[in-house]
Amino acid sequence: MSMCTIVSISQSALKHNLLVVKENSPNSKIVSMVKANAYGHKINLINPIINHSDLLAVSEISEAKKLRKITKKPILLLSGVIEDQELQQAIKLNCQIVVHDKTQITTINNTKQPINIWIKINTGMHRLGLSTHEYFDCIKLLANNPLINTQCVMSHFACADEINHPMNQSQLFEFKKSTYHTTKRSMANSAAILSNPASHFDYVRPGIMLYGVSPFEIINNHLKPVMQISAPIMSIKTIQTGDSVGYGATWIAKKSTTIATIGIGYGDGYPRHAKNGTPVLINNNLCPLIGRVSMDLICVDISNVKASVGDNVILWGAQKLRIETIAKYSDTIAYELLTGISSRVAFVSTI
């Protein structure tokens, strides 16, 4: 019997979700988002993505260094470079570099070695990206440098997870208008891959869907959860009417109740703000959270379930209990939960 919190990473689910990407965008190459340690899944545990993507995208140089140790696949550096030192590191790592700000152009243009770049333009999100005017100035300037090869022009949707949001079409129109002359283009994230075929172009950039999470408010059952987090029942007891559970006595029993204390808490990455009633899965039965989440422990009502000390409890990552559900109960998003697992939790690879 293990008394540890364990995160299991399903290799078959990774393969399945990548296949969903390919089925939805059969004519596009795949740039898989593996930033933030593969959305919290650990880059050393996502071999199906690494082996079967055309490119792998990270945010920072430090992430590119770790990724380069385990693969020779092309790496796209989303944050690009600002200083010459960063440029040299990116070249050494054989990264393709995103240019998203006019201050980067001088650094890029001073290269002494061949480099491949992607140019990012702002079509309405106003986070990163060159304006249309800056973009045309950039391609004119860099076209005179034989060491610089522009691989692709990209942009990013602000509201792709809201299928009918008017910004989706306005951004797509702006992108097409600005890049009509460009051979290779990229705009589609997970939500656009699943809902907007006109945005697929030459490269799609799946992120959250690779890990089995729907980019939309409605859960997508075609995607399979990759991360499953589980912990053991550490204690079972019966409390009486009027007894309270947990810090602050925020939950009070209205009748005799059997409760299980489970060995996971916010110190492991379980959400501190999970509400009373947040479900966990015990022996294929959903049981409600009662009382506040502690650093190391949570309590649930198991009055209607047969369970024993040592039984495994799934906190999220089953078809019956998706991470999207836990995020809603906790007033957060699945991205934050996935990337918030603490270092004391053990990760294992499963079939």
Swiss-Prot record:
Domain of life: Bacteria
Name of the molecule in the record: Alanine racemase
HAMAP family hit by this protein: Ala_racemase
GO terms classed as biological process: D-alanine biosynthetic process
Active site: K35 (proton acceptor), Y247 (proton acceptor)
Cofactor section: pyridoxal 5'-phosphate
Lineage of the species this protein comes from: Bacteria, Pseudomonadati, Pseudomonadota, Gammaproteobacteria, Candidatus Pseudothioglobaceae
Reaction(s) this enzyme catalyzes, per UniProt: L-alanine = D-alanine
Function noted in UniProt: Catalyzes the interconversion of L-alanine and D-alanine. May also act on other amino acids.
Pathway in which the depicted protein is active: Amino-acid biosynthesis; D-alanine biosynthesis; D-alanine from L-alanine: step 1/1
InterPro entries, per database record: Ala_racemase (IPR000821), Ala_racemase/Decarboxylase_C (IPR009006), Ala_racemase_C (IPR011079), Ala_racemase_N (IPR001608), PLP-binding_barrel (IPR029066)
